[in-house]
Amino acid sequence: MDNLRRKEKILIADDESSIRRILETRLSIIGYEVLTAPDGRSALFLFHKEHPNLVVLDVMMPKIDGYGVCQEIRKESDIPIIMLTALGDVTDRITGLELGADDYVVKPFSPKELEARIRCVLRRVDKFYFSNTFTNSGIINIGFLKIDINRKQVYKNEERIRLTGMEFNLLELLISNSGEPLSRTTILEEVWGYTPERHLDTRVVDVHISRLRAKLEDDPSNPELILTSRGTGYLFQRIMEINKNYNPIIQIQKI
């Protein structure tokens, strides 16, 4: 375990003491600093006091449920959030993602599965924050969007659009393959770092696509940038096609 990883704090919020105890023990052994909270109010207190690197939220918690905690965190931070959801409730999973969670794990779960998801999400976030060391990236203008690759920022009609690390990584993947359909499985593997074991695993992709459309498209119900490829997955419209309808044409400016 490297020194950087050992400094990372994980906040576990779950009202089941056995789950908190098991996860605290296992995650501590592999080098994380672990904080635990038995309810949503305590989770928010620890979030503001300790500034964790990643938060794991159970949906059903007293005082403030996982949805409420997720909403409050997203008002001020884009740190990774993983939801713990009930096995039979698809609504729990989708709602959490729509509120800004990056991923979910279904209860009952193997601690090893959650450990793997935590590693994957943190690795992707590391890529988001540290990939600005590349010198051959710059600013890309696509229609009404300006994408600053170095600073990992997106502007729509000159107004800053706030994206989470996962959302930016997803957008970057789509743009780098513009005009090429990408399957949900491919997107999940490239952005989240794991292969789906169940069909429902790919719903995380659908919800993040929906979130990107809501933030970037003029009319999310009739998208012009991020298109659905029937029977395949999604694709980002060919950049030259986009710029036929917008002015100025695409420019790449070195920083």
Curated annotation (Swiss-Prot):
Signal peptide: none
Chief subcellular location: plastid
Entries under PROSITE patterns matching the protein: OMPR_PHOB, RESPONSE_REGULATORY
Gene3D superfamilies: 3.40.50.2300, Winged helix-like DNA-binding domain superfamily/Winged helix DNA-binding domain (1.10.10.10)
Database matches in InterPro entries: CheY-like_superfamily (IPR011006), OmpR/PhoB-type_DNA-bd (IPR001867), Sig_transdc_resp-reg_C-effctor (IPR016032), Sig_transdc_resp-reg_receiver (IPR001789), WalR-like (IPR039420), WH-like_DNA-bd_sf (IPR036388)
Any one Gene Ontology cellular component term annotated for this protein: chloroplast
One Pfam assignment: Trans_reg_C
Annotation: DNA-binding region: 78-96, 137-238
Protein localization: Plastid, Chloroplast
Domain of life: Eukaryota
Function according to Swiss-Prot or TrEMBL: Probable promoter-specific protein mediating the interaction between DNA and RNA polymerase.
General remark: Although originally identified as Cyanidium caldarium, these sequences derive from Galdieria sulphuraria.
Protein name: Probable transcriptional regulator ycf27
Organism name: Galdieria sulphuraria (Red alga)
Classification of source organism: Eukaryota, Rhodophyta, Bangiophyceae, Galdieriales, Galdieriaceae
